[in-house]
Swiss-Prot record:
It comes from the Bacteria. It is a multi-pass membrane protein. The lineage of its organism: Bacteria, Pseudomonadati, Pseudomonadota, Gammaproteobacteria, Pasteurellales. Its main location: membrane. This is Uncharacterized protein PM1237. Keywords: Cell membrane, Membrane, Transmembrane, Transmembrane helix. It is found in: Cell membrane.
Length: 78
């Protein structure tokens, strides 16, 4: 694989990560605190935990989105 292709895929990963951070910021600042905590608790309960698990899942979204964008972009440019 050429270096140029890897660089383009890394740029796409960065864009994906920034987009996810912007979406998270909008949701966090627009929702009332009680509703946000309820959503995080609900997400955490889906995996057998509580609010902390929901927060950790939320924190894992930007790198996960970046990885998806990276591999998808590598596949598209192949």
């Amino acid at each position: 694989m050429s270096e140029q292709l890897k660089i383009k895929a890394m740029r796409a990963a960065g864009v994906g990560c920034v987009l996810m951070l912007m979406i998270i910021a909008l949701v966090v600042f627009m929702l009332p605190t009680g509703i946000l905590i309820d959503y995080l608790t609900l997400a955490g309960s889906w995996v057998g935990g509580g609010t902390t698990f929901g927060i950790l899942m939320l924190a894992a979204l930007p790198p996960l989105t970046g990885a998806i964008f990276y591999y998808f972009w590598k596949w598209v440019l192949k």
